[in-house]
Amino acid sequence: MNITTINYTRACPYISRANIADQFSISLGSVDKRIKEIKQEIERGRYKTNAVIKDGGIVLVNYLVFIDYEINRQKLLDSNARKYAEPYIPSELAKDIGWYN
């Protein structure tokens, strides 16, 4: 007798404010501050405009963008150190967090 199993993995590229706060163990106030800072990075060209989606009371953030921002936040906030921040390459970051091989 053969048994066939199927593993199904789902990765959603966007995450809500509440889920960010829960997953990263930070307050909603900290999440809102980081979203504001990410929007500034969108204006500077680091991230695409769809990195943060806002529709009414719903705010979703691209998961990979949030992780990248957390990794590079201190450098990006310092005008002298920001040139040393690693470039944002979503495919490499996705591999690093195990989304795909």
Residue ranges with predicted function:
Residues 1-2, 99:
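Intrinsically disordered, low-complexity and often Lys/Arg-enriched segments
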Residues 2-37:
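Polyanion-binding surface elements
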Residues 11, 18-21, 51, 81, ...:
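A sequence-composition feature that detects small, non-aromatic residues
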Residues 19, 65-66:
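Short, well-ordered alpha-helical scaffold segment located
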Residues 23-60, 67, 83-88:
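Major-groove DNA-recognition helix of helix-turn-helix-type DNA-binding domains
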Residues 68-101:
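Helix-turn-helix/homeodomain-like alpha-helical modules used for DNA recognition
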